[in-house]
Amino acid sequence: MEKVWTVKIAGPAGAGVKSAGLLLAQILNESGYFLKDYSEYPSLVRGGHNTYQISFSKGEVFGVYQKLDVLISLSAGHWQEHKKEMKKGGLIFTDNEGENNLPLNEMSLQLGSRIYANTITLGLLVYLFALDKKLSLKIVSKHFGENENNQRAFESGFKYGENNFREVVSSEEVNSKKVSSKKKIIVDGNEAVGWGLYKAGLNLYAAYPMTPATGVLHFLAKNQDEFNIKVVHPEDEIAAASIACGNSMAGGRSATGTS
């Protein structure tokens, strides 16, 4: 069985936890790895405790593993409740809190804002797992556009790893060569539901946005022209169910979703 590595990024809402996790997932996917990931977050615009966890391997991965190889805290204190999740020899990176030091506050402010902490973290992770730097920068640039500070942030995180954690790089087991040439895509659960509805012949989707089902509505709305379906956002869930039932009674294939 192929070795599975698991990484968790933790921090407050608004710190870019999910962005860093999604970008790492894209880099791993483009590098040929198999992966499973998930995020946890409260119903807050800022603050609270958010995490993004990824398990990846050269072989197929069928779930997110509980024990962590690497834990990175984007802000003070967000690593503490996950200490017991660490594997023996696992690495915890914090900002001057007694673990492996990653001075995210200082490094990001040198670039002008705390918002770059997540991209610095991504650069460090790419270094630690000996992933392809050129490919990673291409994905970062595509995601953030022409903002050169994000590229500088990635470079600073990568260089910090080179200068301080050379001895812990997993290059013997993880490498920058493409593991699998088989083309794979990354989808979340809601997108998978949306694809399933489309492939099943859906012609109308009516829904009121309510977490966690909102993603299905957004996915189908974004693709309604390509899929040749009608997406309706009515005033409430009862109206959505009524529209779906009416379309079905008229001979259409319809669906609705809520939480």
For each of these PLM feature ranges, what is it?
Residues 1-200, 204:
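Active-site cofactor/cluster-binding pocket
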Residues 21, 217-251:
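Glycine-rich phosphate/ribose-binding loops and adjacent secondary-structure elements
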Residues 12, 39-42, 184-189, 208-210, ...:
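Active-site nucleophile and cofactor-binding loops and adjacent substrate-binding regions
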Residues 74, 78, 84-86, 236-238, ...:
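Phosphate/diphosphate-binding loops
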Residues 121-126, 191-199, 214-218, 239-249:
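Contiguous, well-ordered alpha-helical segments that form the cores/surfaces of helical PPI scaffolds
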Residues 46, 63-69, 227-230, 251-258:
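Short, basic, glycine/proline-bearing loop/turn elements
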Residues 44-45, 213-214, 221:
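Short secondary-structure capping/turn micro-motifs that flank functional sites
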Residues 6, 198-204, 224-228, 249-255:
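Short, surface-exposed connector motifs at secondary-structure boundaries
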